[in-house]
Design a protein with these regions (language model features):
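An N-terminal hydrophobic leader/cap segment in hydrolases
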Residues: 3-44, 52-54
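Soluble extramembrane regions of membrane proteins in the secretory/endomembrane system
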Residues: 30-294
């Protein structure tokens, strides 16, 4: 009787087994074989909005052994799961990570602003403020960063500007020590870059299909060696006598201590493949090792 029932429902049981095994192995990978705790959290912001995020906390991090903190911001119409690979790679190297659902995406609330990236960083600004106030005892508040792809990259640029202006007004260090901008260069403009007090890494796909919006046109639209956007980002950090007319890809310009370190990458990829490519991911990991060091 039991054998007949098992035989009759074999396909169902097989599928359920695959689901459970896949979930188990996915959990093992997400937690870096149990070395990282992953928790779904929610932040109620002062303006009545709700930001939902996954917190990746290395188990070795505590109030005595504080670690850097990086906010990961997905792009337009993407929920937090779209960049879970970046959160996993950074957390397994000892960083605490907040992988957010941007405002109006995933489980986060809608935004009260029509300019959610510019004025709120899709929720990243509020989270940086919250963490900088010392609400996570295991975080080194002098090593807070952000990374994002596409519109999430724009949020990172806007964060450097927003917290840079705040630092200038209060004559303090920027709360946002370092940012990494992936797949977005449209807002690398002088009026936005001039107040940045954050180190900045930039990664842009050479074959990005959105490059037609950039300042250069034709085949050179995405060439970050000569693009006005990348040249501005680098020259903004250099004295006038040392400014350049061609960017050396992968070279670090400026000073980490002065919070004007700059580096530009130009991987031979299409826009949507950038966050999942081995070379582009390695460039981002190496950047955060450079600015923060691995705990």
């Amino acid at each position: 009787m039991i054998y007949e029932k098992l035989k009759k429902n074999f396909s169902l049981l097989f599928c359920l087994g695959i689901i459970f095994l896949s979930s188990f192995f996915a959990s093992i990978i997400q937690t870096s074989f149990g070395s990282v705790d992953v928790e779904l959290k929610e932040l109620k912001t002062d303006d009545g909005q709700t930001l939902v995020y996954d917190l990746y906390k290395p188990k070795l991090a505590n109030s005595s052994d504080k670690v850097p903190f990086v906010v990961v911001v997905p792009g337009f119409q993407r929920s937090k799961e779209a960049l879970s690979n970046i959160a996993i790679e950074l957390s397994r190297r000892g960083f605490a990570i907040a992988l957010i659902d941007p405002y109006a995406q995933g489980m986060s609330s809608s935004s009260t602003s029509r300019l959610a990236a510019t004025t709120q960083g899709y929720g990243m600004f509020a989270l940086v403020d919250y963490v900088h106030e010392g609400n996570f005892a295991f975080v080194d508040i002098n090593k807070i960063g952000s990374t994002g792809h596409s519109m999430g990259g724009n949020a990172a640029i806007r964060g450097a500007d927003y917290f840079g202006k705040e630092a200038i007004r209060s004559s303090t260090k920027s709360k946002l020590d370092s940012v990494f901008v992936s797949g977005y260069v449209l807002t690398l403009r002088d009026n936005i870059l001039k107040d940045s007090k954050s180190n900045m890494g930039i990664s842009y796909a050479l074959y990005d299909e959105g490059a037609f919006r950039n300042e250069l046109k034709g085949w050179d639209a995405a060439n970050m060696e000569i693009a006005p956007e990348s040249l501005r980002a680098v020259n903004n950090a250099l004295p006038k006598e040392n400014q350049i007319d061609r960017v050396e890809l992968g070279k670090y310009y400026g000073s980490k201590e002065e919070k004007n370190l700059r580096v530009v990458f130009n991987e031979k990829l299409l826009h949507p493949f950038q966050p999942y490519n081995k070379e582009a991911t390695a460039n981002q990991i190496n950047y955060f090792e450079k600015v923060f060091g691995f705990p």
